[in-house]
Design a protein with these regions (language model features):
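Conserved kinase catalytic-core helix
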Residues: 1-28, 32
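A conserved long alpha-helix in the C-terminal portion of kinase-like catalytic domains
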Residues: 72-117
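Alpha-helix boundary/N-cap detector
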Residues: 4, 80, 84-87, 141, ...
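Membrane-proximal basic amphipathic "stem/tether" segments
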Residues: 120-168
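Catalytic activation segment of kinase domains across protein kinase-like and atypical kinase folds
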Residues: 21-77
């Protein structure tokens, strides 16, 4: 079931692909921020974050799978708790026929580091370490803390965006 939804989402991403890259406006179009409509199209319902530069579609796939892994690896699901984030990401990518390279992973780490340190109160070094830990260390309580931190930072960003838009 998850993979079928991911395949539909990936088709949506590839349709936006221009010259091997997608708009940085799609940065927050991770699969749990999108919905599959009855006609088979994808609707984005949460897109408060964006990136100034275009990104490779594979980096967006890594970001989606990373956020999914962080969200559910602390849900006491044995197969996720025993895996490293990078293992989950690579397994999902393989299932939909996408090759993830070290270059894609490095780009993801850099984008996620700058994004999270920009909307949060942690230094880039701390965020980079937390992202790497979530990618390469099997389930630790640190993953839950990272997930909580990401949700808190996104909440702060949402409140800030609403306040700037005058919608307090």
């Amino acid at each position: 079931m998850l993979i079928a939804g991911v395949r539909s989402w990936w088709s949506f991403v590839l349709a936006a692909n221009a010259g091997g890259r997608v708009s940085g406006d799609l940065l927050d179009a991770v699969w749990h921020n999108c919905g599959l409509l009855a006609d088979g199209s994808i609707a984005r319902f949460d897109h408060e974050l964006s990136w100034a530069a275009d990104i490779e579609p594979e980096v967006l796939l890594i970001r989606s799978a990373f956020q999914w892994h962080v969200r559910y690896s602390s849900a006491k699901l044995p197969h996720l708790m025993a895996s490293r984030g990078i293992g989950t990401i690579r397994a999902i990518a393989r299932r939909i026929g996408v090759d993830i390279t070290q270059s894609h992973i490095r780009q993801f780490i850099e984008i996620e580091t700058l994004l999270q340190s920009g909307i949060g109160y942690s230094s880039p070094e701390r965020v980079r370490s937390a992202v790497r830990a979530a990618l390469y260390v099997p389930h630790l309580p640190a993953l839950k803390r990272l997930g909580d931190s990401l949700r808190t930072n996104f909440g702060r960003a949402s409140r800030l965006m609403r306040r700037l838009a005058g919608k307090s």
